[in-house]
């Protein structure tokens, strides 16, 4: 498949514009836009649209493919084909889609799958989703007790399981049961909303809290994070606040007790019961005896033997920056790694060797004092307490 994809000239890159206007576009996404033959986009605001057109004047808005007399699925098929036609013409096509381009986005996955099956090079670059914004604004770590994400209608239609002991995120709560498209939905058209509330009440009870969340689009706005009980969401004045871009966050029920696998804990050599850390454990304190002791030790801390600082000077840093941000430079590198490295000045032999090899262990090690490959374990940063220590 790799050989076949390189045999055809056209290629497809899908990127996300994020949620916040302009500022959520990654450097990688902007670089892809600038270097595309044509950009096809569906974004949420005019400022982002204008920014895309500024970066690449040959840009086309796919939003016009929506129609109030069409099913959304038909529109998504057309959006995918609009990009694929140009890929088949041999063009370097970039599709820009609101949020993360692979999260609750149908045409991107369709286009990528078809492009790859036809032998074209196709890839997706990550972007920021509404859920990423929700985690940041509400201060939630999904790893604390686990997290499940559903589309609201999907939850109901397929009777998806709800785990009250974990975080729950629900998308598209403002258009429950809607498969058509309108340019201007109103809250009174969300006639199946109570069906969603019935499902939540069944799992959590009427007094359990739900946070109604909307991420800010422009820097002039603040996030909307309104907490209601499930019962309150049935009130007309509250229900009317739910829009097409609304997301629900449902916290775990604090009454749910953790179930431990005693046999497994023993096999791991853990003699105590794991606990949920602060701030996710309402019974924990931010400055208990353990926390105070760790903070006291901070004053006398010295970098451990295994720590390797970044080199003060390295020609490899500038090279990697170019490879990250300039697709044409990356193309030259891929054509002949050895010739590319030999043509560069200011690199040590170790740095050249690392560049030719190209794997993360060798490259990461070449940027650090010592020049030796980095242990893979050192590349994994686990900031959440495992509950086993």
UniProtKB/Swiss-Prot annotation:
Native species: Coprinellus micaceus
Modified residues (N-methylisoleucine): 384-385
InterPro entries: 4pyrrol_Mease (IPR000878), 4pyrrol_Methylase_sf (IPR035996), 4pyrrole_Mease_sub1 (IPR014777)
Gene coding for it: cmiMA
List of catalytic residues: 72, 76, 98
Residue(s) carrying N-methylphenylalanine: 381, 383
Protein name, as recorded: Methyltransferase/ribosomally synthesized type I borosin cyclic peptide precursor cmiMA
Record-linked Pfam families: TP_methylase (PF00590)
Region (Clasp domain): 254-370
């Amino acid at each position: 498949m790799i050989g076949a994809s390189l045999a055809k000239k056209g290629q497809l890159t899908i990127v996300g514009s994020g949620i916040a206007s302009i500022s959520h576009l990654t450097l990688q996404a902007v670089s892809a836009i600038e270097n595309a033959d044509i950009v096809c986009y569906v974004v949420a605001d005019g400022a982002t649209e204008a920014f895309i057109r500024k970066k690449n004047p040959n840009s086309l808005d796919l939003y016009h493919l929506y129609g109030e007399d069409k099913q959304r699925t038909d529109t998504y098929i057309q959006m995918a084909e609009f990009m694929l036609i140009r890929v088949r013409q041999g063009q370097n096509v970039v599709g820009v889609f609101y949020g993360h381009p692979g999260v609750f986005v149908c045409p991107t996955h369709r286009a990528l799958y078809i492009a790859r099956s036809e032998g074209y090079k196709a890839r997706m670059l990550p972007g920021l989703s509404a859920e990423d914004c929700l985690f940041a604004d509400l201060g939630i770590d999904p790893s604390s007790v686990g997290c499940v994400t559903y589309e609201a209608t999907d939850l109901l239609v397929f009777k998806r399981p709800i785990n009250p002991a974990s975080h729950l995120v629900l998308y598209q709560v403002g258009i429950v049961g809607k498969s058509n498209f309108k340019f201007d939905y109103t809250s009174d058209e969300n006639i199946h909303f109570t069906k969603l509330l019935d499902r939540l009440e069944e799992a959590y009870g009427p007094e359990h809290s739900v946070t109604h969340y909307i991420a800010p689009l422009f820097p002039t706005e603040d996030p909307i994070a309104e907490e209601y009980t499930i019962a309150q969401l049935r009130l007309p004045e509250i229900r009317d606040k739910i829009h097409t871009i609304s997301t629900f966050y449902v916290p775990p029920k604090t009454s749910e007790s953790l179930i431990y696998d005693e046999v497994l804990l023993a096999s791991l050599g853990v003699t105590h019961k794991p606990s949920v850390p602060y701030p996710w454990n309402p019974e924990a304190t931010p400055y208990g005896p353990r926390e105070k002791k760790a903070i006291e030790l901070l004053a006398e801390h010295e970098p451990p033997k295994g720590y390797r600082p970044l080199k003060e000077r390295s020609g490899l840093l500038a090279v990697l920056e170019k490879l990250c941000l300039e697709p044409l430079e990356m193309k030259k590198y891929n054509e002949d790694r050895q010739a590319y490295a030999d043509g560069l000045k200011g690199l040590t032999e170790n740095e050249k060797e690392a560049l030719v090899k190209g794997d993360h262990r060798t490259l990461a090690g070449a940027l650090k004092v010592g020049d030796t490959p980095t242990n893979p374990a050192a590349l994994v940063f686990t900031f959440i307490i495992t509950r086993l220590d």
